[in-house]
């Protein structure tokens, strides 16, 4: 089977101050390489993108995709506000203990997993992947919910970066890349 058939979900959890500058860029390089060979990667964890979303917006292939990305981010922020959640309470206590100080730190690490590829599609939660290349998927940062969304969208593998470690697994093979140096 050709590598061009591969659909890989990109996820992180238990991030620390170094995983965003070590493991996440490594996954981004993998994503770029897979896409150059005709494969597909899917980036999720929308709240983790807050603060770095313009990096992804500027990589959208079309104005329509740009607008869908804006809506993806804004709809999540509106959801948080509707239910009294603060959009700036990220990073988590574990992230902070590991050295991430702001949502900007965490967001810049999150978007690194998408490499430098053009955004080809924006998907609703669990919507099947339709296009080759990099897609953005609506899902929260929660490991269980986001990874299951990736699996439901058709990803056959999830690359999961972590600095602090996690026992998490999901319905599709989950390769953990742990880095804290």
What kind of region is each of these model predictions?
Residues 1:
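Active-site cavity-forming subdomains of large catalytic enzyme subunits
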Residues 5, 10-12, 16-181:
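Anaerobic metallocofactor- and corrinoid-dependent redox/one-carbon enzyme cores
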């Amino acid at each position: 089977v050709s590598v061009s058939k591969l659909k890989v979900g990109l996820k992180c959890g238990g991030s620390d101050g170094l995983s965003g500058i070590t493991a996440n860029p490594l996954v981004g390089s993998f994503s770029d390489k897979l896409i150059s060979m005709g494969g597909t990667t899917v980036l999720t964890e929308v709240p983790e993108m807050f603060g770095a979303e313009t990096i992804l917006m500027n990589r959208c292939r079309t104005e329509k995709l740009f607008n869908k990305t804006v809506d993806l981010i804004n709809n999540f922020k509106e959801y948080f506000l509707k239910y009294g959640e603060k959009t700036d309470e990220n990073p988590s206590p574990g992230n902070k203990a590991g050295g991430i100080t702001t949502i900007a730190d965490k967001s810049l690490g999150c978007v690194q997993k998408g490499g430098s590829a053009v955004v080809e599609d924006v998907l609703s939660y669990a919507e099947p992947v339709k296009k080759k290349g990099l897609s953005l998927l609506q899902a929260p940062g929660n490991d269980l919910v986001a990874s299951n969304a990736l699996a439901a969208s058709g990803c056959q593998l999830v690359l999961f970066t972590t600095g602090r470690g996690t026992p998490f697994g999901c319905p599709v093979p989950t390769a953990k890349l742990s880095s804290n140096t």
